[in-house]
Swiss-Prot record:
Pfam families: KARI_C, KARI_N
CC cofactor note: Binds 2 magnesium ions per subunit.
Keywords assigned: Amino-acid biosynthesis, Branched-chain amino acid biosynthesis, Magnesium, Metal-binding, NADP, Oxidoreductase
Gene Ontology biological process terms in this record: isoleucine biosynthetic process; L-valine biosynthetic process
This protein's encoding gene: ilvC
Catalyzed reactions per annotation: (2R)-2,3-dihydroxy-3-methylbutanoate + NADP(+) = (2S)-2-acetolactate + NADPH + H(+); (2R,3R)-2,3-dihydroxy-3-methylpentanoate + NADP(+) = (S)-2-ethyl-2-hydroxy-3-oxobutanoate + NADPH + H(+)
Family matches, as InterPro entries: 6-PGluconate_DH-like_C_sf, KARI, KARI_C, KARI_N, KARI_prok, NAD(P)-bd_dom_sf
Keyword Chloroplast part of the UniProt annotation: no
The protein, known as: Ketol-acid reductoisomerase (NADP(+))
The species this protein was found in: Saccharolobus islandicus (strain L.S.2.15 / Lassen #1) (Sulfolobus islandicus)
Catalytic site positions: H111
Keyword Magnesium among UniProt keywords: yes
UniProt: NADP(+) binding residues: Y28, G29, S30, Q31, S56, D86, M87, V88, Q89, G137
Pathway: Amino-acid biosynthesis; L-isoleucine biosynthesis; L-isoleucine from 2-oxobutanoate: step 2/4; Amino-acid biosynthesis; L-valine biosynthesis; L-valine from pyruvate: step 2/4
């Protein structure tokens, strides 16, 4: 088992490394808005690059950030930060960034997908690095404003200047990440572990586990409302406990009956066959097969995603959940 020997913090980073450089943040969604405002509030020179004038354009202006068309934002930029969705980045790169960026400008990413799978092939004279906050954009902004920060990963793909890590840590400091801690990784490791986590637990695994448990109870004659509470609604409380106190803390917080049942039946359900399938899923990611399939799916208008979302929206568990929302919300204390 490999473990990092270094976690970078504020004392390892210096904003002076990028002071005076023009930073173009491409995109003004969840992460883009947070990064642009945090970097601006850290005293850095920031503009936002957008493909068209619209809601994001007006939002940036109202936040006091200068919005420009992408090609205008990148032409004078020393540092170009890609904060648009993965599947938009290649087209944006080919049409609005590569033809207009100045020679030697840094390319920065928050996720390694496009670089790792070679959907974007950067110039040989550019530093290429990544800062990947381990939290959503609004949290990155909220923590920064409160004097804290969201932990992040940092990776260097190309270090032409010899100062790529210093610049990456300066960007990380600018968004508040070094206040918490920044862990070194690689584009390969970040991409593959991120995709794996999404597929087998955070989205795919949890979704199918909840669905299977709910349907098992309903098929055996239990009330759907009761099944929903026991297999879906209570998940948040357990996840919050794990987030705040770790798995041990969660186990200490639940009943002895729950501990015993979880420790015995959990391994029966998540058995060696499931672990084997997890390794197969990881191999699809490592081989590039998943990326190849996803690029093709996206190009066809995402029929699998559209159909899957429709099935979820029309499922019994979703209908029951919607019916119970008022009941669930009614019990929340007034803030």
């Amino acid at each position: 088992m490999k473990s990092t020997s270094k976690i970078y913090t504020d004392k390892d980073s210096n904003l002076d490394v990028i002071k005076g450089k023009r930073i173009a943040v491409l995109g003004y969604g969840s992460q883009g808005r947070a990064w642009a405002q945090n970097l601006r509030d850290s005293g850095l020179n920031v503009v936002v690059g957008l493909e068209r004038e619209g809601k994001s354009w007006e939002l940036a202006k109202s936040d006091g950030i200068i919005p420009l068309h992408t090609k205008d934002a990148v032409k004078d930029a020393d540092i170009i930060i890609f904060l648009v969705p993965d599947m938009v980045q290649r087209t944006l790169w080919l049409e609005s960034v590569q033809p207009y960026m100045k020679k030697g400008a840094d390319l920065v990413f928050a996720h390694g997908f496009n670089i790792h799978y070679k959907l974007i092939e950067p110039p040989k004279d550019s530093d290429v690095y990544m800062i990947a906050p381990k939290g959503p954009g609004p949290t990155v902004r909220e923590y920064y404003k409160a004097g804290g920060g969201v932990p992040a990963l940092v990776a260097i793909q190309q270090d032409v200047s010899g100062t790529a890590l210093r610049k990456a840590l300066a960007i990380a400091k600018g968004i508040g990440a070094t206040r918490a801690g920044v862990i070194p990784t690689t584009f390969k490791e970040e991409t593959e572990t991120d995709l794996f986590g999404e597929q087998v637990i955070l989205v795919g695994g949890i979704m199918e586990l909840m669905k299977a448990a709910f349907e098992t109870l309903v098929e055996e004659g239990y009330q759907p409302e009761v099944a929903y509470f026991e297999t879906i609604n209570e998940l948040k409380m357990l996840v919050d406990l794990v987030y705040e106190k770790g798995i041990t803390g969660m186990l200490k917080a639940v009943s002895d009956t729950a501990k015993y049942g979880g420790m015995t039946v959990g391994k029966f359900v998540i058995n060696e066959d499931v672990r084997k399938r997890m390794k197969e899923a990881l191999q699809r990611i490592k081989s590039g097969k998943f990326a190849e399939e996803w690029v093709e799916e996206y190009g066809r208008g995402m029929p699998t995603v559209v159909n899957g979302l429709s099935q979820v929206q029309n499922s019994l568990e979703e209908k029951i959940g919607n019916q119970l929302k008022d009941l669930i919300q009614k019990g929340k204390p007034k803030s």
